[in-house]
Design a protein with these regions (language model features):
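Conserved, well-structured core domains of diverse proteins
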Residues: 1-111, 118-122, 674-690
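Long, contiguous bundles of hydrophobic transmembrane helices that form the permeation core
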Residues: 2-22, 32, 309-411, 514-605, ...
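Hydrophobic mid-bilayer segments of alpha-helices in multi-pass membrane transport proteins
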Residues: 27-31, 52-66, 84-93, 118-127, ...
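Transmembrane helix-loop boundary segments of multi-pass membrane transporters
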Residues: 44-54, 80-84, 109-113, 293-294, ...
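Membrane-interfacial loop-to-helix junctions in multi-pass transporters
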Residues: 115-119, 180-193, 220-232, 264-270, ...
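Core transmembrane alpha-helical segments of multi-pass membrane transporters/permeases
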Residues: 130, 135, 145-154, 160, ...
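Transmembrane alpha-helix interface/packing and boundary motifs in multi-pass membrane proteins
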Residues: 201-205, 236-245, 277-283, 367, ...
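Hydrophobic transmembrane alpha-helices that form the pore/transport pathway of multi-pass ion
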Residues: 214-282, 292, 301, 470-503, ...
Length: 695
């Protein structure tokens, strides 16, 4: 049996049955039209906003019914369900024509709808639901269905969910005709920005950027301790920011890095977890950050470059923790590195392929220069296209370019169905005022305890993420959770970044961690074990959002000194947390030392500046005592450290309340003693480690 074609244009180029050729022709035609339309709009300006959104969504729906048929792959023979696929495709094409032809009467539908208008609205609603079910499964439909039922029967719900119900026709108008439902902000972002950047990512893949990132990462880190895993982290970060898909990143870079980690002795679950955590982090890594950053900029009414700047420190901290966790694991298990003679030379990689960084430089330069995000995307696409001509093997031939367009259209079709479903959720929530009721109810339950609101919000995001994409989780949280955080006084960008992180982290959160589940078969690992390892490695993603809610300086808000201090404190705390989870710092850590380091880590992470030095002392002291002394004598050291840290914490809090100079002197004396002891211990540890090194 011959292999199925990977693209519609490949099917058209070879000897294929007539039904397959017809399907491939339709997919190729719709995908090319879809990509060309958005590229034209990016260069010459988009048509009227509502028209652009409607054409975008209906063409995306048409592509979904072609590329995601029932009961088979698109390239397999037709079956009994093909008639439904054809019906969905035909209705989508008809809706495209209908919305374009009747655009002038769109505003009138807010107050009066004809029978044909009603049919078109119901058809749009049903097609969106079926498209989401085909591409993402039933989870988001269940969530959307709950909010629609609530809107219709709000007077039958208890507590904060009680309210006046919406009439069916009023709700239908809110979901389909209004600009706050299916054709609202999420679809607007998809049509204006996301398609162009996905096309940019497809063109980069065409010219070999993925292989270049892998070679560059391995040339830099392959020969170091834990080299393959570190290279996986770096390459996944670079590719993930372009692809915007954690699962897609796992399946591309992971296909190379995971088997290599396995051959060098890494546990299957750890290899899969490393790739999943790194690929997930690509979605929070500037400058592209996947689709969510564009949606966030739209909701916040901010420039995209402001979102990018705010994301730099949290993303750096996330990858720092994964990088260190991989290093600690390699040290703990005694895993080596790749021989240098088996690795590419960094200078040669950059000399031969460094030009592939040019499109990325165009994005950064365009954003810094203040160009519009659409113009930046168009320039980057042109740069990627031109770079393809440097090597004969990557020439952007017409077939390759059309395959890139097809890939971009397929990816966007799935995302657009998700955005439309999220629009249903938002429209249903605002049709009944549920958002306000939930906000007031949550604040009354949590009272003045912001941490409780954050815990409730994070848990909700994780539950929603069990089967929903990060974009869908974020958009749902915009309507449900973010108003709660804003009402509690959290800065707007911190509230939205909180939602972003917890929307992304669902990819590595058991029991349904989609990125880890995608990596597990490649590594031959148990999916649940892989998801647990991914969550451990990506623990920073659960902590960092809470940190920047309490310390907005981590989002570049505030004076430079505060930003530097908060970043340094967070980095030290997260390093201690990574070491505690792995069980290694400069030597293996015992359970008491790991517990002490967790306590010290959270003291450094806490927003009060007085706790930073105490937490650092506790974590560093625990590691030193554990490394320097035998198990029996170490218990005394751990106990003394714990008592000292508690005493300093109590004195510090009392001083903050009373401002007593005597307490201040006691605090300073204690901290000075501790710093001197830490310095002496560090010197002793350094001499001991140096003496063990071979000459």
């Amino acid at each position: 049996m011959s292999a199925l074609p990977r693209s519609a244009f490949q099917a058209l180029a070879g000897p294929s049955p007539v039904p397959l050729r017809l399907t491939a022709f339709l997919i190729g035609a719709v995908a090319t039209l879809f990509a060309t339309l958005h590229l034209y709009a990016g260069i010459y300006g988009a048509p009227p906003a509502m028209l652009f959104r409607m054409v975008h969504l209906t063409l995306a729906l048409a592509l979904v019914f072609l590329a995601f048929p029932l009961g088979r792959s698109w390239a397999e023979p037709w079956n009994a369900w093909t008639i439904l696929d054809a019906l969905g495709f035909g209705l989508s094409v008809w809706l495209t024509w209908y919305y374009v032809a009747t655009l002038d009467g769109w505003a009138l539908r807010q107050v009066m709808m004809s029978e044909v208008d009603l049919f078109a609205a119901w058809a749009t609603l049903i097609l969106v639901c079926e498209a989401v079910r085909r591409t993402l499964g039933p989870i988001i439909l269940i969530v959307a269905g709950f909010f629609v039922l609530h809107a219709l029967f709000a007077d039958h719900f208890p507590g904060i969910f009680y309210g006046p119900p919406a009439r069916p026709l009023t709700l239908l108008r809110a979901l389909v005709v209004g600009d706050g439902g299916i054709f609202g902000a999420p679809i607007a972002v998809m049509a204006q920005y996301v398609v162009l950047f996905i096309l940019f990512g497809q063109l980069l893949a065409l010219v070999g950027v993925g292989d270049f990132f892998l070679r560059l990462a391995f040339s830099l880190f392959g020969h170091r301790t834990g080299g393959p895993a570190k290279a996986s982290v770096i390459s996944s970060a670079m590719m993930g920011t372009l692809s915007g898909s954690a699962i897609g990143n796992v399946l591309t870079t992971g296909a190379f890095t995971i088997p290599l980690m396995r051959r060098l002795g890494y546990r299957p679950a750890f290899a899969a977890g490393t790739e999943a955590a790194a690929s997930t982090g690509g979605m929070i890594m500037p400058p592209v950050m996947g689709a969510i950053a564009f949606i966030m900029a739209e909701f916040l009414g901010m420039e995209y470059v402001e979102i990018v700047i705010a994301a730099i420190i949290p993303a750096t901290l996330y990858f720092l923790v994964i990088f260190l966790a991989v290093h600690f694991e390699a040290k703990r298990t005694g895993l080596g590195a790749l021989p240098k003679d088996r690795l590419p030379v960094t200078r040669e990689v950059l000399r031969r392929e460094g030009y592939l960084l040019f499109p990325m430089a165009l994005i950064v330069g365009g954003l810094v220069a203040g160009f519009s995000i659409v113009l930046v995307a168009v320039i980057a696409i042109a740069g990627a296209f031109v770079m393809g001509f440097v090597r004969r093997a990557t020439w952007p031939t017409p077939i390759r370019v059309m395959e890139a367009m097809e890939g971009a259209a397929r990816a966007t079709a799935s995302l657009s169905a998700t955005a439309a479903a999220a629009g249903i959720i938002i429209g249903a929530i605002f049709a009944t005022g549920l958002s306000y009721q939930v906000t007031q109810g949550a604040i009354s339950v949590a009272g003045d305890h912001l941490w409780l609101l954050l815990a409730m919000s994070g848990l909700m995001a994780i539950v929603l993420g069990m089967g929903m994409t990060a974009s869908a989780v974020y958009i749902t949280m915009v309507a449900t959770v973010i108003p709660i955080l804003r009402a509690a006084g959290v800065p707007d960008i911190a509230a939205h970044m909180f939602a972003l992180y917890f929307g992304v982290v669902s990819n590595i959160t058991p029991p349904i961690a989609l990125a880890a589940f995608a990596a597990a078969p490649i590594a031959g690992a148990n999916p649940l074990a892989a998801s647990v390892e991914a969550a451990k490695l990506g623990v920073a993603a659960f902590v960092i959002p809470v940190m920047f809610v309490y310390q907005p300086a981590l989002l570049m808000i505030g004076d430079p000194l505060t930003v530097i201090w908060s970043t340094a404190s967070a980095a030290m705390g997260l390093t201690a947390l990574a070491a505690a989870f792995v069980g290694y710092l400069v030597s293996p850590l015992s359970i008491p030392a790991r517990l002490a380091m967790v306590v010290g880590a959270f003291m450094m992470i806490a927003p009060e500046g007085a706790t930073d030095l105490m937490g650092l002392a506790l974590a560093a002291g625990a590691a030193f005592v554990d490394h320097r002394f035998s198990a029996g004598r170490a218990w005394l050291g751990w106990g003394a450290l714990a008592l000292f840290a508690v005493a300093m914490e109590l004195i510090g809090r009392q001083h903050l309340q009373s401002r007593d100079p005597a307490l201040w002197l006691a605090l300073m004396a204690g901290l000075s003693t501790l710093l001197v002891a830490m310095a002496a211990g560090a010197l002793a540890l350094g001499r001991r480690m140096t003496s063990r090194m071979p000459a």
